């Protein structure tokens, strides 16, 4: 039975038992800052379990993509070394939201394993929480598990909680006895060791309590079920193999690596490990990028980069000199297309991103490995086993070696890293990372918003059709804490039952305006949307006292809203134009829409040419002039996608979505505010196009009055330039070309004159030559010559000096310049680089070069004479030392 068949039969089994099959969510958690990646099947149902979200089903089943690499669940360093560790895996699960409980959950699991999968009952063992008599009795009496195979365990192994507070409950694990051959010895047993004889297959979590902050647990009115079973693990068991890497889900990727490398799996232990690493990391890489993560130096992108670079290093160990991971990542998506068709459609995009990252790392990998090898040899010579933290930091900062990659390489040399020293070097970067991922204060405020939502606060948005409205004030936050009233001058956050103010989301900034209630007047400077149905107005009380329970009049700043709406519609037109000009691979990777300007990030693999930018700008303006109507409506998500609506990479959408259509030009899923017609935008002007990450470009642009102002500023600049060179705007280009041609002519004349001057100066310098220990020495000061001019003069002197040493000094534009030249026959006795360093130190600078020619600069031209006066003594000392 293949892994694909097991996945299908699992979902079909639970569908036949009244469960709704829910597709896997993206690997990027939606609206959950506490989670780096989706790492369990229940993640996408978290708000349902917490009662914050209602679904139209009470039973669900899924096969969920998961990644564990970073944070609490970090399996990265073990991947490839063991039979079970993965960064990417699939979790099969069934869930009940207040519907069935232990009896049905246990029965479903037992029937699937013993009847659907045909596993022998006498090989299955079960653990329960030591105090969960109910589950124990169900297993024993309902399923007939003998007590010798029914084990009570403690809280560490068999009690699950979502956090320090909230839903929690006992769990029950189903294990399979794989036989004596898998035993670790006489002490082998459940709860006694971690070997694979008794292999955990399925964990059934019974959410039946709510834990308070003081630790008190009270029964939930509607207990729920959350179960999880690793697809790779059950597939390995069903296929009778002892390692997950030998099941067909991963063995096919390993076979592909065998084909590419020309090496056979099983012939060499080190090569086998590298193949396992590449197989696993290719899956994580492919699906993370397909879901919108890009390699970077922070957050999720840095975890992805660590995974990719570890895989690249193992590819090198297999003998690959050129990029190869882009090929294995493509193979992964194509081979898993039946289960995950959408990521497979992005295979070309994924391959390009992976190849770019691989090429960048390969350029520095050899240099980094050389430095690391030298350090290891030095440590061995000193009988030391700890790599200094600053060396590990240099490898990270200069050569892009993540710390765990360095540790991975050193493990085979029995060398560890001074992690405290590394952390000290990383302090500045760590501080930036903390700011990026938000501090505990912001997390606490986020908790306040959730608390308000749990207490029933929610906001209806009325701002699509109106810019004013009245509503009750539900909550006031002062310094992040709820208060019943706030005085004039206070900076507050206000939650109302309804609002016309748009809350920042989807890249569009929040509205500004005013709020009035009783005698209070509030200036609203921003509107946030921390939760899907909670709008928070940020502002300062200008007068009076604001109180909860009052009816407020809310008025949106019409001009700002209109400008923002125009920019948002222009962003949709821009995306459509980019697709038309650059190709279908263009996808939105982010955006920012403000009243002043718009910013659009998109997938593309090279800088846009001036011609491409002009075509895009022209196309957008053509569509503005078409004055196409902008239509918005709600529809089923599936229908919108079927009709061709564009969605944002990795974004989570509900069953109902809002679709914004601009004529026949653009159709996108979007919750933002828009113009009534494209003609309202007036004018579109691109300000700049830049690269922000591998395969991601950014365009910044303005519209309407702002665009007109940019054009006027450009015209004014042209007029000023024309006036400066005494012409008019129509003749500006021709006049500039003539000036540039004249400049080149003058430069050639100057160069010719300089050559003649150099010849004269060279003659004068040669006449001043002295002899030191039998060597001819020419030393002189020639001011107002830059570095290039000094070299040209030196060439003239050397051509006429058959054997000797030349030293030149020049004061130029407030700096000191030095040049030392030594004829080839003398370089074994006297080196130009050594002499110029000594002289440069006297003029407050430094420099160097070849044994026969070296230059230096300094900040103290007033010391030049003293430096040149020291030349005879320095040459004499150098000759005597030789």
UniProtKB/Swiss-Prot annotation:
Cofactors (names): Zn(2+)
EC numbers for this chain: 6.1.1.7
Record carries keyword Nucleotide-binding: yes
Keywords carried by this UniProt record: Aminoacyl-tRNA synthetase, ATP-binding, Cytoplasm, Ligase, Metal-binding, Nucleotide-binding, Protein biosynthesis, RNA-binding, tRNA-binding, Zinc
Top EC group: ligase
Disulfides per UniProt: none
Amino acids binding Zn(2+): 568, 572, 670, 674
Single Gene Ontology MF annotation: aminoacyl-tRNA deacylase activity
Entry's transmembrane regions: none
Any GO CC annotation of this UniProt entry: cytosol
SUPFAM superfamilies: Class II aaRS and biotin synthetases, Putative anticodon-binding domain of alanyl-tRNA synthetase (AlaRS), ThrRS/AlaRS common domain, Translation proteins
Record function comment: Catalyzes the attachment of alanine to tRNA(Ala) in a two-step reaction: alanine is first activated by ATP to form Ala-AMP and then transferred to the acceptor end of tRNA(Ala). Also edits incorrectly charged Ser-tRNA(Ala) and Gly-tRNA(Ala) via its editing domain.
PANTHER family: ALANINE--TRNA LIGASE, CYTOPLASMIC, ALANYL-TRNA SYNTHETASE
Family classification: Belongs to the class-II aminoacyl-tRNA synthetase family.
Protein name listed in UniProt: Alanine--tRNA ligase
Gene name linked to the record: alaS
């Amino acid at each position: 039975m293949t892994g694909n068949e097991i996945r299908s039969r699992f979902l079909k089994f639970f569908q036949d038992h009244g469960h709704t099959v829910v597709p896997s969510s993206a690997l990027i958690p939606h609206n959950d800052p506490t989670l780096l990646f989706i790492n369990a099947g229940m993640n996408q149902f978290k708000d349902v379990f917490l009662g914050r979200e209602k679904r139209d089903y009470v039973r669900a089943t899924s096969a969920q993509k998961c990644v564990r690499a970073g944070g609490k669940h970090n399996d990265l360093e073990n991947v490839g070394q063991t039979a079970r560790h993965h960064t990417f895996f699939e979790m099969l699960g069934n869930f009940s939201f207040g519907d069935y409980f232990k009896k049905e959950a246990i029965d479903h699991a037992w029937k699937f394993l013993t009847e659907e999968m045909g596993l022998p009952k006498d090989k299955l063992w079960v653990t329960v929480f030591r105090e969960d008599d109910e589950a124990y009795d169900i297993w024993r009496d309902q399923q007939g598990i003998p007590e010798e195979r029914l084990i009570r365990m403690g809280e560490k192994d068999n009690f699950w909680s979502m956090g320090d507070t909230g839903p929690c409950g006992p769990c029950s694990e189903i294990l399979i006895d794989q036989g004596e051959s898998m035993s670790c010895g006489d002490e082998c047993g459940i709860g006694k060791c971690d070997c694979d004889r008794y292999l955990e297959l399925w964990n059934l979590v019974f959410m039946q309590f709510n834990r308070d902050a003081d630790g008190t647990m009270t029964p939930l009115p509607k207990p729920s079920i959350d179960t999880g079973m690793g697809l790779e693990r059950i597939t390995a068991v069903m296929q009778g193999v002892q390692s997950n890497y030998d099941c067909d889900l991963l063995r096919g990727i390993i076979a592909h690596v065998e084909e590419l490398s020309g090496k056979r799996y099983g012939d060499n232990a080190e090569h086998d490990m590298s193949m396992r690493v590449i197989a696993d990391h290719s899956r994580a890489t492919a699906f993370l990028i397909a879901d919108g993560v890009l390699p970077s130096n922070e957050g999720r992108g840095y975890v992805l980069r660590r995974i990719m670079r570890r895989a690249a290093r193992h590819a090198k160990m297999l003998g690959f000199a050129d990029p190869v991971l882009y090929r294995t990542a493509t193979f992964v998506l194509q081979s898993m297309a039946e289960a995950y068709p959408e990521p497979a459609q992005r295979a070309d995009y994924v391959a390009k991103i992976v190849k770019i990252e691989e090429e960048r790392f390969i350029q520095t990998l050899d240099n980094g490995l050389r430095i690391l090898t030298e350090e290891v040899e030095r440590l061995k010579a000193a009988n030391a086993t700890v790599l200094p933290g600053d060396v590990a930091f240099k490898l990270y900062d200069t050569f892009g070696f993540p710390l765990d990659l360095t540790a991975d390489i050193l493990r085979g040399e029995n060398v560890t890293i001074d992690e405290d020293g590394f952390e000290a070097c990383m302090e500045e970067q760590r501080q930036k990372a903390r700011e990026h991922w938000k501090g505990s204060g912001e997390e606490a405020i986020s908790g306040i918003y959730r608390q308000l939502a749990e207490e029933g606060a929610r906001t209806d948005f009325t701002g699509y059709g109106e810019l004013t409205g009245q509503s009750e004030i539900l909550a006031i936050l002062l310094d992040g804490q709820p208060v019943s009233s706030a005085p004039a001058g206070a900076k507050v956050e206000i939650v109302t039952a309804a609002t016309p103010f748009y809350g920042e989301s989807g890249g569009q900034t929040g509205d500004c305006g005013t709020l009035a209630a009783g005698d209070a007047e509030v200036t609203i400077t921003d509107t946030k949307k921390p939760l899907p149905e909670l709008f928070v107005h940020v502002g300062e009380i200008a007068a009076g006292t604001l109180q909860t329970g009052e009816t407020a009049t809310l008025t949106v700043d019409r001009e700002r809203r209109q400008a923002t709406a125009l920019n948002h519609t222009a962003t949709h037109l821009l995306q459509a134009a980019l697709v038309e000009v650059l190709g279908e691979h263009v996808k939105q990777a982010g955006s920012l829409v403000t009243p002043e300007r718009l910013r659009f990030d998109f997938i593309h693999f090279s800088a846009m040419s001036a011609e491409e930018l002009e075509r895009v700008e022209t196309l957008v303006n053509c569509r503005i002039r078409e004055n196409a109507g902008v239509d918005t409506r709600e529809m089923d998500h599936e229908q919108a996608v079927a009709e061709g609506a564009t969605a944002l990479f990795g974004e989570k959408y509900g069953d109902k979505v809002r679709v914004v259509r601009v004529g026949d030009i653009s159709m996108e899923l979007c919750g933002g505010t828009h113009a009534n017609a494209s003609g309202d935008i007036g004018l579109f002007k691109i300000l700049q196009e830049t690269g922000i990450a591998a395969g991601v470009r950014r365009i910044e642009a303005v519209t309407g009055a702002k665009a007109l102002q940019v054009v006027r500023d450009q015209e004014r600049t042209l007029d000023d330039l024309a006036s400066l060179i005494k012409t008019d705007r129509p003749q500006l280009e021709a006049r500039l070309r003539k000036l540039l041609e004249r400049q080149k002519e003058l430069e050639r004349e100057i160069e010719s004159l300089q050559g003649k001057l150099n010849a004269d100066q060279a003659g004068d310098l040669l006449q001043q030559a002295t002899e030191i220990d039998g060597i001819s020495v020419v030393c002189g000061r020639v001011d107002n010559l830059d570095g290039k001019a000094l070299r040209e003069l030196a060439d003239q002197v050397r051509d006429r000096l058959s054997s000797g040493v030349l030293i030149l000094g020049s004061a130029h534009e407030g700096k000191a310049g030095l040049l030392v030249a030594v004829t080839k026959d003398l370089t074994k006795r006297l080196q130009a680089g050594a002499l110029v360093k000594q002289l440069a130190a006297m003029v407050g600078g430094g420099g160097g070069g070849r044994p026969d020619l070296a230059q230096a600069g300094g900040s103290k031209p007033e010391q030049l004479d003293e430096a040149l006066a020291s030349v005879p003594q320095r040459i004499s000392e150098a000759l005597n030392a030789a």
